[in-house]
Curated annotation (Swiss-Prot):
Main location class: endoplasmic reticulum
Residue numbers on the Cytoplasmic membrane side: 1-19, 70-102
GO cellular component: signal peptidase complex
Keyword Cell membrane: no
PANTHER family: MICROSOMAL SIGNAL PEPTIDASE 12 KDA SUBUNIT (PTHR13202), SIGNAL PEPTIDASE COMPLEX SUBUNIT 1 (PTHR13202:SF0)
Subcellular location: Endoplasmic reticulum membrane
Residue numbers spanned by region Disordered: 81-102
Protein name, UniProt field: Signal peptidase complex subunit 1
Protein keywords: Endoplasmic reticulum, Membrane, Transmembrane, Transmembrane helix
Family, similarity comment: Belongs to the SPCS1 family.
Length: 102
């Protein structure tokens, strides 16, 4: 059963993370406003809490799993380059010198 879980994608790109954060905050804010208004009109603070908790659960369901909508802009990594500085002796390396500010 665990091999099925390891095949699931777990990454989100940066734009997907931003979208997920905006959606999460928007849903929480909307549910808080609706919950406050309904709780005020019904004169029941419990309904306010229930509506906010339902909004939180709904936003978690929409934003925590890495849905395909959050993976539309994958990162393009640079190819691996051989570092030739490891092969050089200390005397052969270029020394970087910084200009002194007066």
């Amino acid at each position: 059963m665990l091999e099925h879980l390891s095949s699931l994608p777990t990454q989100m790109d940066y734009k997907g993370q931003k979208l997920a954060e905006q959606m999460f905050q928007g849903i929480i804010l909307f549910s808080a406003i609706v919950g406050f208004i309904y709780g005020y009109l019904a004169e029941q603070f419990g309904w306010t809490v229930y509506i906010v908790m339902a909004g939180f659960a709904f936003s978690c369901l929409l934003t925590l799993p890495p849905w395909p909508i959050y993976r539309r802009h994958p990162l393009k990594w640079l190819p691996v380059q051989d570092s030739s500085t490891e092969d050089k002796k200390p005397g052969e390396r270029k020394v970087k010198r910084h200009a002194k500010n007066n």
